[in-house]
From Swiss-Prot:
Annotated compartments: Plastid, Chloroplast thylakoid membrane
Residues annotated as transmembrane: 69-93, 134-155, 178-200, 255-275, 291-312, 447-471
Stated name of the protein: Photosystem II CP43 reaction center protein
Recorded superkingdom: Eukaryota
GO molecular function per UniProt: chlorophyll binding; electron transporter, transferring electrons within the cyclic electron transport pathway of photosynthesis activity; metal ion binding
Residues noted as binding [CaMn4O5] cluster in the record, renumbered to the chain: 367
Listed HAMAP family: PSII_PsbC_CP43
Alphabetized UniProt keyword annotations: Acetylation, Chlorophyll, Chloroplast, Chromophore, Manganese, Membrane, Metal-binding, Phosphoprotein, Photosynthesis, Photosystem II, Plastid, Thylakoid, Transmembrane, Transmembrane helix
Lineage: Eukaryota, Viridiplantae, Streptophyta, Embryophyta, Tracheophyta
Organism expressing this protein natively: Agrostis stolonifera
BP term (GO), one: photosynthetic electron transport in photosystem II
Purpose of the protein: One of the components of the core complex of photosystem II (PSII). It binds chlorophyll and helps catalyze the primary light-induced photochemical processes of PSII. PSII is a light-driven water:plastoquinone oxidoreductase, using light energy to abstract electrons from H(2)O, generating O(2) and a proton gradient subsequently used for ATP formation.
Stored InterPro entries: PS_antenna-like, PS_II_antenna-like_sf, PSII_PsbC, PSII_PsbC_sf
Proregion positions: 1-14
């Protein structure tokens, strides 16, 4: 009887129902992996693996282009983006394309161009993927040594890491260039309710930029998610760009130190596990960012945050009842606390009622009404502008609380709109994917460590007690 694992390879046993099935000339016997393990069969075939990765990039870019055009085709300019289930157009609008004051869409042509460019790019990537998967050399080491590699070659691996870091740094600089020189980006804090503007006065102070990293992630601190002005965001990308580029150059020019050689497992599956861990962290951070941050993700495009919708409801009814003659400064609510206004634990004047829990919300429609000690009573009586009333009424009825088959919005709000907020979609999907990637990290890290420790062949079954027990029947 043939042994289950290949003598040529050193991977886990994969027991197949049909061990003789051959796909693309690579069967389980020669690769150690079954057909359904996909790219695992290509672990040591750098040329074929390149094809798989390029084709995968093509699929990703094709989705981006096709979905982009789908959203353009369905877009109704009269309705806010967040009511239309859009997740790509809000990103383009945030970059300042096609929008004007208040986030109003003036021109959808840039969105169309974006979709077409992604489709064309995906065709190029798709062709490259098919070429390298089917026609190109199986391995790159002989013909193209610069692009070839061996997984355990630590120096080559850190060189590849360095190249990736430089590309990421250049990507960060692209956003900086867009904000500084190519039309600017959308600033939800621009006076009068948001506008596209060039970011001129960058925040480059390391104490400010790295201060975000040192903040607590909880409550009113909010770690990097608490960033609330574009100068800090674009300045942060300047720092990130330089750090990534210089880190990349460092990794290209140096070899791993002894402690790093000892600390890491140096195999393809280990690198996969490290990458999955990083993507998992990114997913969890993105989840919090899109859920809580209304500067990087402006509410004009993504809908209000949960706290923002709640505070907007309190503000809307304060405006209504003040018009009807209520004295909002002294009216008592059912609990004996202020009905419209109360004090926070640190003494600021905040909105009363259930929304007190969201007292540290900052939003561009609300900040003009604050003074040095929180909400300013005289401003609430005299300075409320029509655009602030309109926007808060709109946000009140569009809380990001809907489920797929129910009415969206606050359960007690009779005017709530039946929709699911893009914030709900994006934060939930990134949390779920972040979690799955974390599980994938644990799985592949465990396999990589087992292989490195030398017991990847599985357990010796010869002495299992079950082999010596009587059959159940």
């Amino acid at each position: 009887m043939k042994i289950l694992y290949s003598l040529r390879r050193f991977y886990h046993v994969e027991t197949l129902f049909n061990g003789t099935f051959v796909l693309a000339g690579r069967d389980q016997e020669t690769t150690g992996f079954a057909w359904w393990a996909g790219n695992a069969r290509l672990i040591n075939l750098s040329g074929k693996l390149l094809g798989a990765h390029v084709a995968h990039a093509g699929l990703i870019v094709f989705w981006a282009g096709a979905m982009n055009l789908f959203e353009v085709a369905h877009f109704v300019p009269e309705k806010p983006m967040y009511e239309q289930g859009l997740i790509l157009l809000p990103h383009l609008a945030t970059l300042g394309w096609g929008v004007g004051p208040g986030g109003e869409v003036l021109d959808t042509f840039p969105y169309f161009v974006s979709g077409v460019l992604h489709l064309i790019s995906s065709a190029v990537l798709g062709f490259g993927g098919i070429y390298h998967a089917l026609l190109g050399p199986e391995t790159l080491e002989e013909s193209f040594p610069f692009f070839g590699y061996v997984w355990k070659d630590r120096n080559k691996m850190t060189t590849i890491l360095g190249i990736h870091l430089i590309l990421l740094g250049l990507g960060a600089f692209l956003l900086v260039l867009k904000a500084l020189y190519f039309g600017g980006v959308y600033d939800t804090w621009a006076p009068g309710g948001g506008d596209v503007r060039k970011i001129t006065n960058l925040t480059l102070s390391p104490s400010v930029i790295f201060g975000y990293l040192l903040k607590s992630p909880f409550g009113g601190e909010g770690w990097i998610v608490s960033v609330d002005d574009l100068e800090d965001i674009i300045g942060g990308h300047v720092w990130l760009g330089f750090i990534c580029v210089f880190g990349g150059i460092w990794h290209i020019l140096t070899k791993p130190f002894a402690w790093a050689r000892r600390a890491f497992v140096w195999s393809g599956e280990a690198y996969l596990s490290y990458s999955l861990a990083a993507l998992s962290v990114f997913g969890f951070i993105a989840c919090c960012f899109v859920w809580f941050n209304n500067t990087a993700y402006p509410s004009e495009f993504y809908g209000p945050t949960g706290p923002e919708a709640s505070q907007a409801q309190a503000f809307t009814f304060l405006v209504r009842d003040q018009r009807l003659g209520a004295n909002v400064g002294s009216a008592q609510g059912p609990t004996g606390l202020g009905k419209y206004l109360m004090r926070s634990p640190t003494g600021e004047v905040i909105f009363g009622g259930e929304t007190m829990r969201f007292w540290d919300l900052r939003a561009p429609w609300l900040e003009p009404l604050r003074g040095p000690n929180g909400l300013d009573l005289s401003r609430l009586k005299k300075d409320i502008q029509p655009w602030q009333e309109r926007r808060s009424a709109e946000y009140m009825t569009h809380a990001p609380l809907g489920s797929l088959n129910s009415v969206g919005g606050v359960a007690t709000e009779i005017n709530a709109v039946n929709y699911v907020s893009p914030r709900s979609w994006l934060s939930t999907s990134h949390f779920v994917l972040g979690f799955f990637f974390f599980v994938g990290h644990l799985w592949h890290a465990g396999r990589a460590r087992a292989a490195a420790a030398g017991f990847e062949k599985g357990i010796d079954r010869d002495l299992e007690p079950v082999l010596y027990m009587n059959p159940l029947n």
